[in-house]
Amino acid sequence: MFYSLSVKNFILIDELEIEFSKGLCVITGETGAGKSILLDAILFCLGYKTSNNIIKHGKDYTVVNIIFSLNEKIKKFLIQNFIEPEELLLVKCLQKAEGRKSFFINNQIVTKTLIKQLANYLFELHGQNNNITLLEASTQRDILDSYGDLLEFRVKLAKCYQIWQNTRKEIEEITVKQNVIEQEIDYLNFVTEELTKLNIQIGEEETLTNIRQDLQNKNKDLQLIRDIIAQINNPEINISINRAEKLLARQRDNDRFKAIATSLEEAYNNLEVARQELSNLLDSFTYEEYNLEETEERLFLIKAISRKYNVPANELGIFLDKSLEKLVILKNKIANSHKLQAQEVLLQEQYYKLANDLSARRLIAAKHLEESLNQELKQLKMEKANFKIEIKTAIDPTASGNDDIVFKASTNPGMKAEEINKIASGGELSRFMLALKTSLFDKMIKPSIIFDEIDVGIGGEAADKVGDRLKKLSSVTQVIVITHQPQVAGKADLHIKIEKTQLEQETKIKVKALNLAERQRELARMISGKTITDASLKVAKELLYPVACPHDQK
């Protein structure tokens, strides 16, 4: 609820501070006294659109502070927006002549958007030009569902709707991308088959590179052996040695040639040994595990695949694993599409079953609310008015159900019921809202409700009934009323008077909380005008009797 309001340099106000109370708070004053300025100050502080010229003439800034009491919803909102709750809630708006507005919550600077979101938790405003929320379809739906205790059921429906819509969205995404997904599956099938077949191991490229180098070195040795064998296997060598031996055999008795013959024989034997060793060495190369041609082919293939997929050879195995994982996911998407379609049908059936149930409950609640509100309108002296709730099947289902809900009314007999905003004046709309609030009573109630001149165009018994309903409503929430009716003001728990004083150089506004005697004179003024008579004082005293002597009331 509103705890206090302080204003400085705002339009005609130099500086003022008002403390509010629980229950019914009324604000009165002569026409043109500036009652609406207080309302403008509240709206200014809470981020609503106000007139441009709000800074008092001759001043370079204006500031408005409002202190509110807290409830659990407000505390939760503050915590969700990283603002530490304190014992009371301080909201401030500062505007300098040359700059934009600055908003604060508990002295922490915040955005205008956040302030307006917070305001939804703090109060409602109903008046000549401020019944916009009543005209919104969402508000009318919420009013009906609150009256019929259907909000929890609606939460259940909303959850079902959300799951249904998420499933539909997933199906649509798969359908739109199905061709792309199928192409990607074909590509990944090819990739995984190719890489699986190649079976490239981690470190294989490095191993094969080393083997190739080794084989290249061995091939050089092999070629050398073959060249040597080719030389020593030359038939001319054996022929030459045989001829030399035959020539030496003729000189076997000559001691000078014996040593040469022996050396020549040893040379022949050594040559045979060399041939054998070279042959054995050659045979050992024949059974190597790798050959250079195969190794180079494998290396070429690995490098080509690495370039093809732009993946380092050492990471081709990881690339294969990831491709296999992605392939499984995409195949599951296609497979799940059919499951999702079946699931979507079931969810749709479940949604419409719940929505139809909600519609049936709304029809029952609408009938009872119509009866209750029409009875309240009679109490507010709008006997000729007739309130109706029209419920039609919506074109598109929503999280709130499958109904279009429209509040309609006729204000005179024989008139066709039209949408409530088309047939009701600002004051009538306010009384419609008062009737709704009284019918709902302890439901959909915010900490504070402000009614701006709800009693315009009525008087006498009708004004008294409006006052009774406001008083009843104030038992469950703080009600602040700007009024011209003494019957309404007489029922207040707190009476605030606004006076405007015209000086030579400027106009000033004074705000005061009245005591009982002051209230009597103010009510008398409201009854008889500027000239207060004994008769008006007597009537004022009678209006205040329930306040002055509460224990005498039954």
UniProtKB/Swiss-Prot annotation:
Organism of origin: Rickettsia prowazekii (strain Madrid E)
Binding site for ATP: 29-36
Protein name according to UniProt: DNA repair protein RecN
GO terms under cellular component: bacterial nucleoid
Function statement: May be involved in recombinational repair of damaged DNA.
Keyword ATP-binding: yes
A Pfam short name: SMC_N
GO terms classed as biological process: DNA recombination; DNA repair; SOS response
Family: Belongs to the RecN family.
GO-annotated molecular function: ATP binding
Keywords: ATP-binding, DNA damage, DNA repair, Nucleotide-binding
Highest rank taxon of the organism: Bacteria
